[in-house]
């Protein structure tokens, strides 16, 4: 049993390839075989052209912070030891936006437009959670 006490992501048939790739420390998103659009969160059809043809394609993991919040209060007991912690929305170079924790950056230094890159947190043997840190 893992010592990780925070909620784990719910793995579904639609998002299973995302979590399998994350476990290998790869960031993969769905890409439409019809129009070429990347999208996230995962789903059964392209949100632009409604094509059911999609592939799970590796993406760069690089992007910029488009929005953020810093939590100074633990709304759930499992997060009390992390206060303060940042949650960012990152616009990836490929277009989609992902919401994740920002790590290794003091809250006062977080800025909209800050370049970031993905890192993976191996929270259990089965689950690696994508997070972001300041890009080198």
What are these regions (language model features)?
Residues 1-27, 134:
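A broadly conserved sequence feature marking short terminus-proximal activation segments
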Residues 40, 53-55:
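Short functional micro-motifs and their immediate structural scaffolds
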Residues 55-64, 110-114:
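Short coil-to-beta-strand transition motifs
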Residues 26-29, 43:
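Residues immediately within or flanking Cys/His clusters that coordinate Zn2+
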Residues 68-73, 121-123:
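Short, conserved beta-turn/loop elements at beta-strand boundaries and strand-helix junctions
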Residues 95, 99-136:
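Well-ordered alpha/beta subsegment
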Residues 82-98:
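Short, basic/aromatic beta-hairpin or loop at an interaction surface
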Residues 31-34, 45-51:
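Short, cysteine/histidine-rich loop/knuckle motifs that typically chelate Zn2+
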